[in-house]
């Protein structure tokens, strides 16, 4: 048993010694670790400094990317976020370096000294205990051997009292071996605990360092997200992103607003800007873009409606200021510009879409309510022209006469309640002129040679042949000379108007290639419903100066009423200033952009790509007599379009103008005067308001197409003596005087140019 115990104790002692030897042999490893950790911490400090400098430069790059106009704002933002994450990593790295030196290296160095002491102490304690135990066992074993020898001697002598002592000694030896074994086991445990404790201490020192490192490396996930963003932003370096395109659009929009916000505002600010940019392409597209298609009118409506049907281009005339919906489409104008399937005889049609009723005996034989609508105009004509045409509530197309056409043949325009900027104020006045002619048509005067029968020609009589029924054959030449004088004076005074009409409601941007001729510019001018005309020479110089610096519709009553008020305004545009004399056709200036063909010379801004506009010199009929009013007249020749509208709107027919006209204030007589001058005459069948419209209609009818009548082929028939009225002699002179006096407008009480009022 002693040998077994000895063997076990030797094994335990050997294990202890091995453990102690391992612990003592681990010191160089720990020391090397501490050394390398110190070097790492030193490098981390250097890295932190270098990282700080690197991130400063990185931030500058990110700021540059953010502030660059090359469309890298998103890239700069992502780089800034990445830089911020790297800043955070830098801070974590600082903390990691501090933890490495404070929590691992320095404590481990201190612990190494303790570990060495503990290992040495364990080895000493074990050696001491083992030596003591072995000494006791040896002593007991020695005593036991002595007792055994003594016992043998006693047995040989026959004595038996020594045996119990021997047994006790052997037990003591066994106990000592057991104690030694236990001592060895304890020593081994202590050695194992010490060795394990060292690693536990090391882990406790390493944990703060690892935690700081984990916190630092936790920023990697954010870097991964930012890296994906940068990858998507820089996927295609040769393609501009939407933000870069927006930069270009912003710059373009800024330049555009800078270019087009310079002109002053017109009276109607909403229509001025639009109409100024959209006011001139129609003169290049020489067609009446509103003269095709069908028109349907509600019987209860007093407004003119225009469909949006696009007209084809007619190649005959170039239109800058021609009257496209001045009330009637003259024969020559129809032949040159209307692409609709109507025959050339369909001249007696209102430009507001109504078919002008037949002037044959059948038409005016009916009652007033059922006859052609020129018979009975409502009393609303005495009011200022709020609606361009106040029509009575008649049937849809009235009585069917030779001049009637289906709705598909009636020219129509867009559904606007106001006339276009090139409208002539002839809608109502020409109706009254027709009204005046109806009794003459009933008189059955001789028809023109080569013309259709009287009844059919009355219905199809071109309105361009505006003649006076009150002119005697002997007075034709004198009246024509007076008319020519008035027209010549009016043409000289209307120097500005050829460009005014094309630039109606324009604030300066009126090039001919600005907008298409069918642009849906449907903004009506609120200041163009009152058009007053003047051929008085003393007002025209002042008017020219005013028109150069005003963006009000040039020929409206507003512009004349406020003429002196706006003389100090700066010029809105020099595009409309004329360089040559030319006749003018005054229009009710709505911001429309469709124009009918006209050869009227107009001074316009040169086209960007279309070249100069062909301009015809106006022809003034000086020696040609005016045809008297007849029941039927031949259609105007093809040269009518060139001469139509070359007279001032104020030009009256020769010999027309009643005796009472001279007594009427000139402010009450104009193309669109609120109250038309009364015309006392011997025709009781015509109501008073219709007689009032006669001189006005004659004047504007003559203005519409007088030359076409004068150049009509064939003999000029003389009017029937039954058709002559007693107001023949002084009519032309009084009318010319009224025209020369011009129009005097009443003062208004408001400064609002877009909403004039007349007291």
UniProtKB/Swiss-Prot annotation:
GO terms for cellular component: actin cytoskeleton; adherens junction; cytoplasm. InterPro entries: AH/BAR_dom_sf, I-BAR_dom, MTSS1/MTSS2, WH2_dom. Residues 612-627 have a biased composition (Low complexity). It is found in: Cytoplasm, Cytoskeleton. The modification Phosphothreonine is found at residues 262, 429, 607. Residues 108-157 form a coiled coil. GO terms for biological process: actin filament organization; actin filament polymerization; adherens junction maintenance; bone mineralization; cellular response to fluid shear stress; epithelial cell proliferation involved in renal tubule morphogenesis; glomerulus morphogenesis; in utero embryonic development. Residues 1-254 form the IMD domain. Keywords: Actin-binding, Coiled coil, Cytoplasm, Cytoskeleton, Phosphoprotein. Binds to actin. The WH2 motif at the C-terminus binds to actin monomers. Inhibits the nucleation of actin filaments in vitro. PANTHER family: ACTIN BUNDLING/MISSING IN METASTASIS-RELATED, PROTEIN MTSS 1. Belongs to the MTSS family. This is Protein MTSS 1. It comes from Mus musculus (Mouse). The gene is Mtss1.
């Amino acid at each position: 048993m002693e040998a077994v115990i000895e063997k076990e104790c030797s094994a335990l002692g050997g294990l202890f010694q091995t453990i102690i030897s391992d612990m003592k042999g681990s010191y160089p490893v720990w020391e090397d670790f501490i050394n390398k950790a110190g070097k790492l911490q030193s490098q981390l400090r250097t890295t932190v400094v270098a990282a700080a400098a690197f991130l400063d430069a990185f931030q500058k790059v990110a700021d540059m990317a953010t502030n660059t106009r090359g469309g890298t704002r998103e890239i700069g933002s992502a780089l800034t976020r990445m830089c911020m994450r790297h800043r955070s990593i830098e801070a974590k790295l600082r903390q990691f370096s501090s933890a490495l030196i404070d929590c691992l290296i320095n404590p481990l160095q201190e612990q190494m000294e303790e570990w060495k002491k503990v290992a040495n102490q364990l080895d000493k304690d074990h050696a001491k205990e083992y030596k003591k135990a072995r000494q006791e066992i040896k002593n007991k074993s020695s005593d036991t051997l002595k007792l055994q020898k003594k016992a043998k001697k006693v047995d040989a002598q026959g004595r038996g009292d020594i045996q119990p002592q021997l047994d006790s000694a052997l037990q003591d030896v066994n106990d000592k071996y057991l104690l030694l074994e236990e001592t060895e086991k304890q020593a081994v445990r202590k050695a194992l605990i010490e060795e394990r404790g060292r690693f536990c201490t090391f882990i406790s020192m390493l944990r703060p360092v690892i935690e700081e490192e984990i916190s630092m490396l936790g920023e990697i996930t954010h870097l991964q997200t930012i890296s994906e963003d940068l990858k998507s932003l820089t996927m295609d370096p040769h393609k501009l992103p939407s933000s870069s395109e927006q930069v270009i659009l912003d710059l373009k929009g800024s330049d555009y607003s800078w270019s087009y916000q310079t002109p002053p505002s017109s009276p109607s600010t909403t229509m001025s800007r639009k109409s100024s940019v959209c006011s001139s392409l129609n003169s290049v597209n020489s067609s009446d873009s509103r003269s095709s298609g069908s028109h349907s009118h509600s019987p209860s409506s007093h407004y003119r409606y225009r469909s949006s049907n696009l007209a084809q281009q007619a190649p005959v005339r170039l239109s800058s200021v021609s009257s496209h919906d001045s009330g009637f489409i003259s024969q020559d104008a129809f032949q040159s510009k209307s692409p609709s399937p109507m025959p050339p005889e369909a001249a007696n049609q209102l430009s507001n879409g109504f078919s002008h009723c037949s002037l044959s005996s059948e038409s005016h034989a009916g009652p007033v309510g059922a006859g052609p609508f020129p018979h009975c105009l409502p009393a609303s004509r005495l009011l200022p022209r709020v609606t361009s045409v106040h029509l009575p509530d008649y049937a849809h197309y009235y009585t069917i006469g030779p001049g009637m056409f289906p709705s598909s043949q009636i020219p129509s325009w867009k559904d606007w309640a106001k006339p276009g900027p090139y409208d002539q104020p002839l809608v109502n006045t020409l109706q009254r002129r027709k009204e005046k002619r109806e009794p003459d048509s009933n008189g059955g005067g001789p028809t023109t040679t080569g013309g259709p029968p009287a009844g059919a020609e009355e219905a199809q009589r071109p309105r361009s042949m505006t003649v006076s029924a009150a002119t005697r054959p002997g007075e034709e030449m004198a009246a024509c000379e007076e008319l020519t004088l008035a027209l010549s004076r009016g043409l000289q005074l209307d120097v500005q108007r050829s460009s005014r009409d094309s630039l109606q409601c324009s604030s300066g941007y009126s090039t001919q290639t600005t907008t298409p001729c069918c642009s849906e510019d449907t903004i009506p001018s609120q200041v163009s419903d009152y058009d007053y005309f003047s051929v008085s020479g003393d007002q025209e110089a002042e008017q020219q100066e005013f028109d150069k610096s005003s963006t009000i519709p040039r020929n409206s009553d507003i512009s004349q009423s406020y003429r002196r008020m706006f003389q100090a305004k700066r010029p809105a545009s020099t595009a409309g200033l004329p360089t040559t004399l030319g006749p003018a056709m005054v229009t009710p200036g709505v911001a429309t952009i469709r124009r009918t063909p006209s050869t009227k010379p107009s001074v316009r801004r040169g086209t960007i790509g279309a070249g100069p506009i062909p301009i015809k010199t106006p022809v003034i009929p000086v020696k040609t007599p005016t045809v008297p009013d007849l029941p039927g007249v031949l259609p105007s020749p093809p040269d009518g379009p060139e001469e139509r509208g070359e007279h001032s709107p104020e030009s009256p027919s020769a010999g027309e103008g009643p005796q009472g006209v001279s007594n009427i204030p000139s402010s009450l007589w104009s193309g669109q005067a609120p109250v038309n001058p009364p015309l006392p005459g011997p025709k009781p069948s015509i109501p008073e308001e219709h007689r009032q419209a006669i001189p006005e209609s004659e004047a504007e009818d003559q203005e519409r197409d007088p030359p076409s009548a004068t150049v009509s082929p064939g003999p000029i028939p003389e009017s029937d003596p039954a058709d002559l009225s007693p107001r023949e002699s002084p009519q032309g002179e009084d009318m010319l005087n009224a025209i020369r006096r011009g129009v005097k407008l009443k003062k208004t009480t408001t400064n609002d140019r877009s909403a004039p009022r007349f007291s």
